[in-house]
Amino acid sequence: MLAIIQVGHNDASDRYIRNKVKAVMQAGMTAEVINLPETCTTLDVLDAITLAGRSSECRAIMVQLPLPDHINKEAVLRSIPEHMDIDGLNPRSDLMPLTPCAIMRWLKEQHIRLPGKNVTILGRSELVGKPLANLMIEAGATVTVLNSLTEEWFRRNACYSADIIVSAVGKWGAVFRDYVNNGKKMVVIDVGINRDNDGKLCGDVSHLARELVERNGGICTPVPGGVGKWTVRELVIRLAEMEGRHGTNIVPE
């Protein structure tokens, strides 16, 4: 069983959790969502993790991020038993976070080779940016990681010259038209989940940038239905491994 601990509610997290539970159940396994109020304390979250870890049925624990500001995220993640840390977020865990692994699996399935490629990653989080950069460097790519302090001229040039852009900023329009090289087929991996000016679910990539990438014959991953979907699939694969299951029927479509 997978235990998912959620503090409070927001649209993106609620949607993501529903997709996780559905995929796990479709694969013949079980998941339980433990909802805690937004007003709970760090100690309340730690207690929930301890109780889940003591369950004889529980094989994996994940804490849905982001957590409210008053919760000590570092203490929470460190408290997840390493052998149950399916998300790989405990600093002592040997596992990589799910999303970078899912992106690497997708690149392999699409036959997109990394050796010699120039990759620009927007965002340096512990959840996506940093671990993905390490995986891509190990695979032979030249990787540039940008953050909120990166000057705009450098950001634009790094994206324009890239073969692959990964945006994990969490801001619609973080990648706009001027970042796209009109003369090459680029791969743009959109990790963000946001709302545009019309309230429609979208990623970090602006509509004009997405259109230009696709018009040039490149790939711009969809939101929804892209990275989030791959991450859920990676979750199911990892849960099956933790439960000692084998077979192709564990992988959701």
What do these predicted ranges mean?
Residues 60-114, 118, 156, 173:
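Anion-binding alpha/beta catalytic cores of soluble intermediary-metabolism enzymes, centered on
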Residues 44-56:
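Short, well-structured alpha-helical segments in soluble
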Residues 1-2, 176, 249-253:
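Flexible, glycine/charged-enriched surface loops at secondary-structure junctions
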Residues 7-21, 97-191, 196, 200-217:
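Glycine-rich phosphate/diphosphate-binding loop of Rossmann-like nucleotide-binding domains
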Residues 2, 24-38, 143-146:
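Short beta-strand elements in bilobed, periplasmic/extracellular small-molecule ligand-binding domains
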Residues 14, 39-46, 70, 97-101, ...:
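Electropositive phosphate-/nucleotide-binding environments in soluble metabolic enzymes
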